[in-house]
Regions:
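Acidic, Ser/Pro/Thr-rich low-complexity regulatory regions
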Residues: 1-160
Length: 160
């Protein structure tokens, strides 16, 4: 598998920070590793590496020096995969995962088909009512849909 271009990886990290899918420490470690191995890495990596991992706003701004503002379809798929991994691993509750999906749909440009799918999943969960049989079925549909996307996050989450 070919390495992910720096701009794509930075776009993933930027959006993942916004959605709460990653911590700043992970992003700073990545920038440090890129600087250590690639003498021709874009200068923006120095700004990312020098940013406090706790200052997510500044970190996201620094990542913009490496990537564009619009996330590619591959980045969006990876974000969904990362959300699915967190849900499957128990790092995020179902309710919080639905909030992440809502934020993704509202804040990140997604294609029409994905927008419609996210909207349908959200409406199904909202209409089903908590603690009912239909709610369990709606939750299961979301879990299965996200599980199918988990591998899309692999290369982005394993970037060094």
């Amino acid at each position: 598998m070919a390495p992910i271009p720096y701009g794509e990886q930075a776009a993933f990290f930027r959006a993942a920070l916004f959605l709460g899918l990653l911590k700043g420490e992970r992003v700073v470690r990545w920038a440090d590793a890129v600087i250590a191995r690639d003498g021709s890495a874009p200068a923006g990596f120095i700004e990312v590496a020098a940013t406090s991992p706790e200052d997510l706003t500044t970190l996201r701004h620094a990542l913009l020096t490496v990537c564009g503002e619009k996330e590619s379809a591959a980045v969006v798929r990876a974000l969904l995969g990362a959300a699915g991994r967190d849900l499957s691993a128990g790092r995020r509750s179902f309710k919080d995962t639905m909030t992440v999906l809502k934020q993704l749909r509202a804040s990140i440009a997604v294609d029409r088909a994905l927008n419609d799918r996210l909207k349908t999943l959200g409406v199904d969960v909202a209409l089903a009512g908590a603690g009912t049989g239909p709610a369990a079925a709606a939750e299961q549909r979301v879990r299965e849909w996200l599980r199918e996307r988990e591998s899309d996050a692999d290369a982005f989450l394993e970037a060094r």
